[in-house]
Amino acid sequence: MSQFNAKAFLADVPHLPGVYRMYDANQAIIYVGKAKDLKKRLASYFRSQVASKKIEALVGNIHHIDTTITHSETEALLLEHNYIKQHQPKYNVLLRDDKSYPYLLLTKHQHPRLTAFRGSKKVAGEYFGPYPNVSAVRESLNLLQKIFPIRQCEDNYYKNRSRPCLQHQIGRCLAPCVTGYCSQQEYDNQVKWVRLFLQGKDSQVIDYLMQKMEIAASELDFETAARFRDQIQSVRAVQEKQFVANQRLDDLDIISIAYQSGLACAHILFIRQGKVLGNRAYFPKVPSHTDLTELADTFIGQFYLQLNQHRSIPNQIILDQPLTESNALAQLLTEQAGHKVTIITNHVRGDKSRYLALAQTNARAALSLQLKQSTTIHKRYDALKILLKLPTIKRMECFDISHTMGSQTVASCVVFDENGPLKSDYRRFNIEGITGGDDYAGMEQALVKRYDKPLPIEKIPDIIFIDGGKGQLNRALQVFEKLTVAWDKHKPLLIGVAKGAERKAGLETLIIGRLKKEIHLPIDSPALHLIQHIRDESHHHAISGHRKKRQKAFVESGLESIAGVGAKRRQALLKYLGGMQGVKSATLAEIESVPGISKTLAGVIFDTLHNS
C-alpha cells in the first residue's frame, strides 16, 4: 500500500495548467493526466470519498508525482498524449494500433506518378485518403491503373528507360519515359481525370471522356473512340460498386464507442469527398472501472494527436459520446490540421445521423465478435493453467525455424498474452554461421539473441514453447543454463511441442520442462487448441521471413558471382534497371548507363547473364 504524503505534496502544487505523472515504487509511470488547474485536479484524487474503484487502486499505488506546468490547457492536452504514447501507463486507456494510414499519392513531376504512400507527408504532391488498410489502397491503385494508364514506377526506374516496360505492353502505362509514345497533353489529360476521379467527381470524368469519344468518332478515329468508350464503361462500373455517401458532405470521421465486460471498441467510418472510403475498428486497452467519457477523451486524443501517426484530420469529427474538453481538443486539432476542425457529439441529423447509426451498429457487432473470441481465448488459457498446474499465465512465447535445404535460415518468435497474439512483440532472427540444416544450432542462436540480455519483468514469459521434440528442448534447456542475466531465468517453463505421426494436427506430444514429462492431449482439448494456435503462428511467421530472405538471395545471386560487382554496384544495377528481371533483359547500352558501371564491366555483366 502506498505511503505517499498527499498533503505535503499538494502544498507546493500551483493553480496552473499542466501535466502530471504518477509513479509506483518501481519508478514506473502508472498514470498520466492533464489539468486546467493542477492543484484542484490532483487534490481530487485524495478526497475521503473516492470517485471510483479505479481511482482507489491508482492512489493505492502512488509512490510520488511529477508535474509539468504548461502555458495553456491546449498545450497540456498535447503533452499528455505524448507522455501516454511514450510510457504506456498501466491506468491510462491505451490505443494499441500504432500504424499510420495509407494514402494514394499523385506526385508533382512532369509526368506525375500515382502510388501508395504511408508515413510523413514530406513528398511533394497530392494525397488522397486515408484508406482503412493497405489492401484497400492497393485495390484502388490496381483499379485506377487499368482505367487511367499513368506511371507507377520509381523515379530511378523511370529516368533510366530506353524502351517501354511490360506495363505499357499490357496497356497500363502510356510510357512517358520514352520519347514518341505519348504527348505531354495526352498524359496531362489522364492525370487530370485521375485527380477528378479521386476527388469524387466521377460524373465530370465521364463527361470529359464522352466529349473525347464523340470528337474521335466524328474524325473517324474509331480506335481512339473505342479506347475512350472502354474507359467510360470502366468508370461507370466503379461507380456502381462504390458506396457514395453524399457529395455535399464534408470530409468527416464518424466514431462510435462501445464498451462491455471490460472490452471497448471504437469504430471509425471514413468519409472523404462524399464517398465512404472504408471503416476500421480499434480495441484500446482499458483499465478496470473506466467510464465512457474518459475512454472517449483518451481515444480521440491519442488517435489524432500522436505526432508520429501523420493522421489525416477531417473537417468534422462526429462522436456518439460526450467529451470533457471538446473545445480545447477542437482548437488543438485545428492548429495541427491547418484548417478548422469541429467536433460534434450531439444533435446529429440527416445523412450524418444515419452514418452514425451505421457506425454504432458496426461497433456493437465488432465488440460482440471480440468478446466471443476473448472468451474462447480465456477458456483455453484456463485449461492450460489447469493442465500445467500454473496459478497464472500472462505471457507465452513460441519459437520455430524455417529454411530450404539448410539455406536462408530464419527463426521466429511469436508472443501471446491473455488476449491472444501480441503481434507488436513478434520477432524474427537471421541465423548465420551454422552448418546448413542444423536446427538445433539455429534454435540455440535464436534463444541467445532473444534472452541473453536484460528484460523487464513484464517481458519475461511464463511459458516458452519450442517447436520440436526432446532434442530441441534439450538444446533450449542448455541455453538457459548458460545464461548469465539479472532476471529470473528459471521463471519460464520450457515445453517442447513434438509433431505426431504423419505430422497431423491433434497428435502432438508435449514434453514438459526439465523433467521431460510427456503429455498427450485429446484432440478436442482447449489447452491443445491454444498450443496449436501459438505453434501455427510461429510457423507462419518463420516461413514468411524465410521466403523474404530467399527471394532477396535469389534476386542478388545472379550478380554476386560476377567479379567487380560488389554490394554497391549490385544495388545500383537493381535500382536503375528495375530488379533482376530488368537487369537480365537490359541491353549492353542500358547496363553501361548505370552509374558506377564501366563499359568493360558492362560487357562482362552482359556476357555473364546471357551465357549462363
Curated annotation (Swiss-Prot):
Domain GIY-YIG: 15-93
GO CC annotations, alphabetized: cytoplasm; excinuclease repair complex
Keywords: Cytoplasm, DNA damage, DNA excision, DNA repair, Excision nuclease, SOS response
SMART domains listed in its UniProt record: GIYc
CDD domains attached to this UniProt entry: GIY-YIG_UvrC_Cho
Subcellular location: Cytoplasm
Domain of life from the UniProt record: Bacteria
Assembly information from the UniProt record: Interacts with UvrB in an incision complex.
Family: Belongs to the UvrC family.
HAMAP family according to UniProt: UvrC
Entries under PANTHER family matching the protein: UVRABC SYSTEM PROTEIN C, UVRC/OXIDOREDUCTASE
Protein name, per record: UvrABC system protein C
Organism annotation: Haemophilus ducreyi (strain 35000HP / ATCC 700724)
